[in-house]
């Protein structure tokens, strides 16, 4: 079993709803860590259990780090108030009490920002070339083709439709050779 002689204490954070945006959870450092710098590498983050974390179990979310490090968060299987997190530090840092370590942006399905109508049709474009003599007719044809109003020229899909049988395989040179 491996032993570690230089064990640093876990980073403890509390989840709080952001005062400016209710769809953002701030994770604030609870204890003082200024006496010991956090070196490059992975550090465990202990997230205090909180009812605010329940929002992460019901909605999609994105994690945003607030420094030169990455944060990975995972939900806990049998707990809706718990969160596992780890910080991957890229450079030595000092952490202070009350500092925001990371945030999560919650994407609620009932959020009015996501209820905007989405247009599924593509915008109409006209394609002009230098040699077009009849610009309006070509533009109309290009729009019709883009909307699917014109038949595709040069392709006959019906000739490729058979009775459902697989085509006969082609013979290769190795098929005729005798094997010992």
Curated annotation (Swiss-Prot):
Note: Shares some antigenic similarities to the smooth muscle protein telokin, but is not similar at the sequence level.
Domain of life: Viruses
Annotated Pfam families: TLP-20
SUPFAM superfamilies: Tlp20, baculovirus telokin-like protein
Alphabetized InterPro entries for the sequence: Telokin-like_Tlp20_baculovir, Tlp20_sf
Amino acid composition bias (Acidic residues), ranges on this chain: 156-165
Protein name, per record: Telokin-like protein 20
Disordered, as annotated region: 112-180
Organism: Autographa californica nuclear polyhedrosis virus
């Amino acid at each position: 079993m491996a032993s570690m002689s230089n064990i640093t204490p876990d980073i403890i954070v509390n989840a709080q709803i952001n005062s400016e945006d209710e769809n953002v959870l701030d994770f604030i450092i609870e204890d003082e860590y200024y006496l010991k710098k956090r070196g490059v590498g992975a550090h465990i983050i202990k997230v205090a259990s909180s009812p605010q974390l329940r929002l992460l179990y019901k909605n999609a979310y994105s994690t945003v780090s607030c420094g030169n490090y990455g944060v990975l968060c995972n939900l806990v299987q049998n707990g809706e108030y718990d969160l596992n997190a780890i910080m991957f530090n890229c450079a030595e840092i000092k952490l202070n009490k009350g500092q925001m370590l990371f945030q999560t942006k919650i994407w609620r399905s009932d959020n009015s920002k996501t209820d905007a109508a989405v247009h599924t049709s593509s915008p109409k474009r006209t394609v002009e070339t230098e040699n077009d003599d009849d610009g309006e007719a070509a533009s109309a044809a290009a729009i019709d083709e883009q909307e699917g109003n014109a038949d595709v020229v040069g392709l006959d899909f019906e000739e490729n439709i058979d009775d459902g049988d697989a085509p006969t395989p082609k013979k290769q040179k190795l098929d005729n050779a005798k094997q010992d």
